[in-house]
Amino acid sequence: MKILQISYHTAPFGSAGKYDSGGLNIYVEKISNELSKNNYVTVVTAEKAESFVNDNLEFKSLNLFDKDLSVEDKEIYLQEFINKLYESVDLESFDVVHTHYWLSGLVGKEIANKFNKPLVYTSHSLGIFLDGYNKERVDCEKIIMTSSDIITTSSLFEEDLILKNYNVDFNKMKLITPGVDTEIFSPDSTLKRENIFLSIGRIQEQKGQMETIKFLDNFKKVENNFICYFVGGPSGKSGNEYLEELKKTVEDSNLESYIEFLDNLPQTEIRDLLNKSKLLIHTSKFETFGLVAAEANAMGVPVLTTNSGSVLEIVESNENGYYSESLIDGNVNNFVKELLNNNDKFEEIMLNCLDKSKAYSWDNTAREIEILYKDFA
């Protein structure tokens, strides 16, 4: 089977956690690697990156724009991207087209219609998440979903949102959860845990890093033996401005000895940090899944979250983490303080994390996707 994966606005197979690169990039990279074991897979992007061919896997960048261009400005290159695809890729030869994010969905819709190919769509994010409700984007997403043969969702939360807001036929939807790369995210039990907290994600307002800083400012009143590393680089048009706002808040709150910003890091370095940490603080407002929470659990790290959607399908309070609508809460302080000071309690929760993370495997994710393709190809 020949499979075309379209990731128009951001290039997989590179570092994640800065600009527009995040969970989508990891998702496309991991499923493409797995699918290429038994199929021919071509991944195309418009973002500048180094193309390569590795056995059955081809990654092709059409080099139309830089990584740091805002996603809004990337939209204007759509037609040029489609034209160049027609010129440089034998699109008729593919058995199935799988698009990731709404901009890729617009490209895939045209290709699938022109060559009568089955179209699979994975949103990774939804326009209804955005402040002010981006009607143009939501209207495009509705058109893409109507045109797609199958829409894959990453969580029950995402599935429910799409059904309620996009008027999609339930029979076109397939729930396939993302996985965890256990070749990377496997803990070294010989390493000693330290009083380290992590906040991992692109620096943008919807990721909620300011909420984490306010929690740390409050928590230090009851426990001051900790440090929190923020892993991720600025993303979006206001990312740099938001980062400066975060740093100023840290300075104004006298938290410089408790907080350090590390920019984005390779997954292997994130793994090494997780291996020493006792807590991941997750304050992202909107997630279709919450990959970093599953990866943290795979490293034995509990997750403190304010996300009341998809992340609660991963995290269960007092089992492998803790959910609270607000982090400024005495119960939250008690939970975190016990993780730091009660080794038996941390060990118990760590084992729960490891056990629950076994549900997530890229091998299983790719297998389910491959079965889906074969139903239509």
Model regions and ranges:
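N-terminal subdomain of nucleotide-sugar transferases
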Residues: 1-53
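Conserved donor-binding/catalytic core segment of Leloir-type glycosyltransferases
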Residues: 2, 191-207, 213-216, 228-231
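Carbohydrate-associated surface elements
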Residues: 157, 179
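Nucleotide-activated donor-binding/catalytic signature segment of Leloir-type glycosyltransferases, i.e.
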Residues: 243-265
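Short alpha-helical donor nucleotide-sugar binding micro-motif in glycosyltransferases
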Residues: 264, 272-277
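Aromatic "clamp/platform" in nucleotide-sugar-dependent glycosyltransferases that forms part
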Residues: 285
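Short hydrophobic beta-strand element within catalytic cores of glycosyltransferases
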Residues: 302-305
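Conserved acidic donor-binding segment of nucleotide-sugar-dependent glycosyltransferases
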Residues: 317-318, 322-330, 338-343
